[in-house]
Amino acid sequence: MKIIVFGAGAWGTAMALSAAAHPAGHAVTLWARDGRQADAMQAARQNARYLPGIAFPAALALASGAPSGALASCRADLAIVATPMSGLRGMLEELRDATIPVAWLCKGFEAVPAGGETAAQGLMAHEICSQVAPRLRAGALSGPSFALEAAQGRPTALVAASRDAHVRELLVEAFHGPTLRVYANEDIVGVEVGGAVKNVLAIATGLCDGLDLGTNARAALITRGLAEMSRLGLALGARAETFMGLSGLGDLVLTATGDLSRNRRVGLALARGLTLDQAVESLGHVAEGVYSARTVVRRAGQLGVDMPIAREVVALLDGRSTASDAVARLMGRSPAAELRSC
């Protein structure tokens, strides 16, 4: 199979490496928007910026330039979009006439700026695709995964999500191998809600750990956060069982507890007294939870879904609250039944 990965960040590079190492002998092209980055990776045969020290196999080619031109030149059977959420709309617009399946790796909602939004903001990835490239056969590859571990060939499990059975099957064929298990799921709404909400919740657990509130508090945040994720997903049309799977519980546990989690590290930084800008700058990478948190809370409000943890995260990010005030409000809420539908 011929595969092209658009986006040479950590995760795009990791997935290109995984595909290039597949026993089936895939021919893989890793595309970088910056031609200088592509040249540097070609010369060093590694991505020194995002995954230093991990060598590129001979089966991995490099490309840059116009995405449509790169797609045509490599004659790919499958295109993977590995941009952040902020770049997904533009990339799908460039690939809107592609005749091969396209899948994205980003997790989140389009960002809604403080104080407003436009009709082009606040959507999940599959909604963006339906809006700008409705003819694409498309899906998502998601689940609990840190780029470094996947690139190192450590055991990882992901979910190939699409309403199109052919897309699911092609993603499994492309990536399922000795170190990467890929499960198929037609519930793309549930998979994308899980991938978005877990980032917001990981900021909360980072704050919890940074404030040394204890493991009891962390367990409570993860569990009640999973309830918030499930309520929003069900209201958006997802299946309940999806949230007990890799893209729900699995991704939440990893992102909320793992030291490589960017969103958790934002929470840790805020707990140390850094401003949001300082916390984001210290990462050097995108933390999607910072940008999609407002959308999560807005869509929950539109649907009448109660998400108190996510709401407190947004108040903190917007500078309208402090961590201690957020804890006091969450603990001071009226008693409620553990299991409820909204």
Swiss-Prot record:
EC top class, as a word: oxidoreductase
Pathway, per record: Membrane lipid metabolism; glycerophospholipid metabolism
Listed EC numbers: 1.1.1.94
MF terms in GO: glycerol-3-phosphate dehydrogenase [NAD(P)+] activity; NAD binding
Pfam families xrefs: NAD_Gly3P_dh_C, NAD_Gly3P_dh_N
Record-linked Gene3D superfamilies: N-(1-d-carboxylethyl)-l-norvaline Dehydrogenase, domain 2, NAD(P)-binding Rossmann-like Domain
Protein name: Glycerol-3-phosphate dehydrogenase [NAD(P)+]
Protein's organism: Paracidovorax citrulli (strain AAC00-1)
